[in-house]
Structure formats: C-alpha cells, structure tokens
Design a protein with these regions (language model features):
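Short S/T/G/P-rich N-terminal loop/turn motif that feeds into the first structured element of a domain
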Residues: 1-56, 64-74, 92-114
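A common structural junction motif
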Residues: 77-83, 89
Length: 114
C-alpha cells in the first residue's frame, strides 16, 4: 500500500546564508533526483514553513510501500549523499514519520467485517 515518508528538520544555525542556499541547491539538484530513481519511489517534494528557508522544512517522499524506505537507505547513490545531508541538519530538531494510504482494502483488512 502507498506509504508517505515525512522528514522534518531545520538547517544548523551555524550555517551562513550562502551555505543554506548551497544546501538547498544540493537537495534539489542532487538528492531529489537520486531519491526519485530508487525503485518504488513515486515522488519527492520539499517544503518550507515560516522559517525563511532555514527552518520548519519538510521532505515528503511518496512510495509504493513501506519497503521503499529500506530501498532508499540501501541505494548506493542515495547513501553517498546522506553524509552531507545530515551534516547540514540540526538533528536535535529533526523528526520523521510514516503514513500509509487509507484504502478500501485496508479498511476491510482492519475491520471485523472482512
């Protein structure tokens, strides 16, 4: 079933404005295309809240199923990029969640009506 992986974060306060801009370019030009190539990934979108592109950032990755997350972590291209990604993030404020799509099949599977 379709799964939505959500990652929230702020960039580190120690980054200059130029470094933040460079990280956005890196995310958009290198990370997002690499993620989109992983089998089972439907899309990746990046959003910013009221944090002036420095904070309240959300990455949404829609996948065919929850196993897509493991495929992301095991993908050689994505793994090469993760070190830089995590270096720029304030991991103390970062969060993640998984959401499964509610479908009639899921409701039937979870209900006693079969």
């Amino acid at each position: 079933m379709a799964t939505l992986y959500t990652r929230t974060f702020n960039f580190k306060d120690s980054l200059s404005d130029k470094e933040v801009l460079d990280e956005w370019k890196f995310l958009m030009e290198e990370v997002a295309p690499a993620v989109e190539k992983v089998e089972g990934v439907r899309s990746i979108k990046l959003y910013s809240g009221a944090g002036a592109l420095r904070a309240d950032i959300t990455v949404l990755i829609e996948m065919d199923d929850a196993a897509g997350y493991e495929r992301l972590l095991l993908d050689a291209e994505v793994r090469k990029l993760l070190g830089r990604v995590y270096t720029a993030w304030d991991l103390k404020t970062a969060g993640q969640s998984f959401r499964r799509e509610i479908t009639p099949e899921l409701i039937r599977a979870l209900s006693s009506s079969g």
